[in-house]
Amino acid sequence: MVDVNRFKSMQITLASPSKVRSWSYGEVKKPETINYRTLKPEREGLFDEVIFGPTKDWECACGKYKRIRYKGIVCDRCGVEVTRAKVRRERMGHIELKAPVSHIWYFKGIPSRMGLTLDMSPRALEEVIYFAAYVVIDPKDTPLEPKSLLTEREYREKLQEYGHGSFVAKMGAEAIQDLLKRVDLAAEIAELKEELKSASGQKRIKAVRRLDVLDAFNKSGNKPEWMVLNILPVIPPDLRPMVQLDGGRFAASDLNDLYRRVINRNNRLARLLELNAPGIIVQNEKRMLQEAVDALIDNGRRGRPITGPGSRPLKSLSHMLKGKQGRFRQNLLGKRVDFSGRSVIAVGPTLKMYQCGVPREMAIELFKPFVMREIVAKEYAGNVKAAKRMVERGDERIWDILEEVIKEHPVLLNRAPTLHRLGIQAFEPVLIDGKALRLHPLVCEAYNADFDGDQMAIHVPLSEEAQAEARLLMLAAEHILNPKDGKPVVTPSQDMVLGNYYLTMEDAGREGEGMIFKDKDEAVMAYRNGYAHLHSRVGIAVDSMPNKPWKDSQRHKIMVTTVGKILFNDIMPEDLPYLQEPNNANLTEGTPDKYFLEPGQDIQEVIDGLEINVPFKKKNLGNIIAETFKRFRTTETSAFLDRLKDLGYYHSTLAGLTVGIADIPVIDNKAEIIDAAHHRVEEINKAFRRGLMTDDDRYVAVTTTWREAKEALEKRLIETQDPKNPIVMMMDSGARGNISNFSQLAGMRGLMAAPNGRIMELPILSNFREGLSVLEMFFSTHGARKGMTDTALKTADSGYLTRRLVDVAQDVIIREDDCGTDRGLLICAITDGKEVTETLEERLQGRYTRKSVKHPETGEVLIGADQLITEDMARKIVDAGVEEVTIRSVFTCATRHGVCRHCYGINLATGDAVEVGEAVGTIAAQSIGEPGTQLTMRTFHTGGVASNTDITQGLPRIQEIFEARNPKGEAVITEVKGNVVEIEEDASTRTKKVYVQGKTGMGEYVVPFTARMKVEVGDEVNRGAALTEGSIQPKRLLEVRDTLSVETYLLAEVQKVYRSQGVEIGDKHVEVMVRQMLRKVRVMDPGDTDLLPGTLMDISDFTDANKDIVISGGIPATSRPVLMGITKASLETNSFLSAASFQETTRVLTDAAIRGKKDHLLGLKENVIIGKIIPAGTGMARYRNIEPQAMNEIEVIDHTEVSAEAVFTAEAE
């Protein structure tokens, strides 16, 4: 067997008859499967042991030879070779067809490859193949046209007219085969190339298509007549098994039925031919044979599918490959694994960041082989069998062994759906009682898990390498940052936030205010004994915390703080400043001086002079974690997170915050606000009845009135809220809930959406505290139901988007250090109208500069060319007033099949420079797809007549961008650069005309009357600028401008959608995806190259083809860039394995086979499919081809052997 990690590429071609015979171990002549009495395979049948191999290991059919010692002997009685039964999965048979049969893929596919080769319509082909018409093969001296069709009657008439043997005409696949044999590829290709020089329109398109197919046959060495089969391969029996069920009946694969039909019809045809039966009977049998083979290859592609019992269509060979249940997606890209378990999860608040709790029963089952090995090693049992019995009996001694075995052996936990790479992380197992897995509360956010019945799967990495990989790369404590934006993903939530919020509150005049303590212990003692409250402001000696980074002026003084904050700062990393205020200045620059007492100053005076600080909220904790990570990296951060979690839980328990109905305040002037709104609505309706406004205007005014009323109530709520109210604390701290929840409890519920998505005019005036009336309750249910259905639909949509994104970018890997390009991307802040969606500072962080950046006023060089921009550097550049910077970008990277380190920048998940081998394509796809579920589904209606366009937002807009579709509400763009000289309105046609005067001429653009204009007379516009509001169609922009403009536009559009929903995604992820959409060009004029016009090809391949021609002084080919949606881009990839496993499997394989395509296995997917180690991380060639250096003495002795081995390795590669 060839070693899978040894071969470099995989090719697919058409199989010639001789090739099929070379695979076969014998002809299947009978339709029998197994004998109903003996249950042994029948001779010469579909399960024959002579052809396919023995059914039992090392045993022939008759039982003369048993045992491995007879290996390789062919039994003289039954003719079966003594070998492993596994060969029944590998050995193929064949059927000699008594009449040629066309292969349905090549005849029926779109476009029909057979039709293009012969220049016949698929309709004509069908008539010939299914014996409805004759086709003229050789007219000899008659005036008949070759390839013309004749009906039965015309054929007889022509024979009488010209005499027998005066011309040749046939029907059936045989006729097609004769025609295909006559095709002279070289002559046809030359003729078509001539025709292309003058042809245009439909004629040209057809010629290009034919040329494409003929050229494919010519270059690949496939012969066109191989599209017609004379011999049919029979796949190995274990791939179409028959299994006995409990009731003595058999369940068999559908393929056996389909093969049986072919054999039956083939044998009947053979008999008819022997008997010299009448032509019409033979024809009918040949047609039935053709249909049987069609059904076997692709049942249902032509006519009605052949059905089994219960009128269920049978699954043919094509169906075995297609779809989610097909071979590719079900068995090759994802397999079920052993050493795995699944259970409900429960919270494990006492676990460390890198631990998870595994139930004892589960662990003993998962680690059984390891435990058994130890039992034998400790000599508790003599052999493995006895050890297994010990484990199964539940011997007391196995538990101690289990503890030893699982120490330092990480396990993987996964929660479905795995939307990004944080959905699988490694933990060290801790044995626990019970049956639920225990999960650390902080990793819940990454998994999107909660403990309301979620289940998780556990997997055990077995080999040493797998364990090392899990420990070094996947340990949960290492995954602090989210790969999508580089922000911490393990921020405390809910109780932890609430506990720390309560702990860091300040309050005036509580017991113990103004006490001074010598150190933390004294303060805690006073608190425990009731002398001081957590929130009291007290003094503490600075010298009791010598390791904190105090300023010199602050040492040896007394600092004002609270007992809670002393405890809070006690868990902080030593080198962080003492946190007194929840802001970044305190965190980065140190504690403000106003909290320190001058010698002899009265502490009470200082306390009275200070305002009360707000407590630390969720956002502040996130900032502290980010800062900690920036300074101390993972180990210290994960330890700190555990301390933060424990402190939060402890104090939220002590605080005992609860929610009762009395905690919901009553707004005193609610009735006034609502009456005023009613009054206003009445006025609006009056105005409408008098005809002063349209119905649309009235609707907008009414809904606005109610919205304002709700906002007024909300504002009143915020003004009157008590900071110590438990609901307010939960909301304010970011632990749970937001102002909208609070205002529904205490204010009013407000406007609801009707089932059609339109907002209803009647608001819900009650809140939940007062209770809703029946009608109001009924209105509420619309919204609730819509929410549920939207979520369900959105999840499926978002999942499919992720799948397409992963597919298109799976081969983008960091392949080299520096591609050496001299191009770059000029970036500035992304704005949407007036507001900034993404600042320049955010966009610069973690990127490399392309040119040096200078201070706009002083001209001082802030940072050189090709330098990494850190967070501090980015801030410095923006503070200097720089508005645009040219950076290295994925868009302009010159690396083939991937990106280089400098164009990519830092790896957001680690905060360090990205390493060669990082699969950045997959990470990008997950980063864009994972937040997809958070985006809305709706299309906003800008109500009223203000515009006739609906702005698509949320998930539909993202799909629109990535599929490069024509957007809804498309903007009109200008093709000339110049000034807007006139905008004239034409009332008769309900349009406006915009005139743009450029250097080369005047551009005239017609826009709809209702469109909102983006330009005014006198404005200067660039090519490709939008004249009206709306989305630009990217394909149109590509025609007017260059690739880079389109890439920049798409990047900005994607960011607008995500940022408007509060989701942050790193630019580089979007860049990777967009670059994949623009990596192809279409050849316009081939020049002196041997490219075909109209071909789609990779930019790099196109450049290569031109390079040689230019060097030899010829005319290079010209091309234009093509923007493809991600689905199309995935199918156009150079790897046929990746494309076939994505969508349209049969079409992709048909095309690849004709071209004799080679898959060079560059991406991740194709390597997973064939079971080769993926070329990412340490699987890259540059990491795998490291030869160990031998010692000197050995080198001298083994010199000859080494060189021979080196030669062999090189050949194998």
Swiss-Prot record:
GO terms for cellular component: DNA-directed RNA polymerase complex. Its EC number is 2.7.7.6. Belongs to the RNA polymerase beta' chain family. This is DNA-directed RNA polymerase subunit beta'. It catalyses: RNA(n) + a ribonucleoside 5'-triphosphate = RNA(n+1) + diphosphate. InterPro entries: DNA-dir_RpoC_beta_prime, DNA-dir_RpoC_beta_prime_bact, RNA_pol_asu, RNA_pol_N, RNA_pol_Rpb1_1, RNA_pol_Rpb1_3, RNA_pol_Rpb1_3_sf, RNA_pol_Rpb1_4. Zn(2+) 1 binds at residues 60, 62, 75, 78. The gene is rpoC. Keywords: DNA-directed RNA polymerase, Magnesium, Metal-binding, Nucleotidyltransferase, Transcription, Transferase, Zinc. DNA-dependent RNA polymerase catalyzes the transcription of DNA into RNA using the four ribonucleoside triphosphates as substrates. SUPFAM superfamilies: beta and beta-prime subunits of DNA dependent RNA-polymerase (SSF64484). The RNAP catalytic core consists of 2 alpha, 1 beta, 1 beta' and 1 omega subunit. When a sigma factor is associated with the core the holoenzyme is formed, which can initiate transcription. It is an enzyme of class 2 (transferase). It comes from the Bacteria. GO terms for molecular function: DNA binding; DNA-directed RNA polymerase activity; magnesium ion binding; zinc ion binding. Its cofactor is Mg(2+); Zn(2+). Zn(2+) 2 binds at residues 819, 893, 900, 903. Binds 1 Mg(2+) ion per subunit. Binds 2 Zn(2+) ions per subunit.
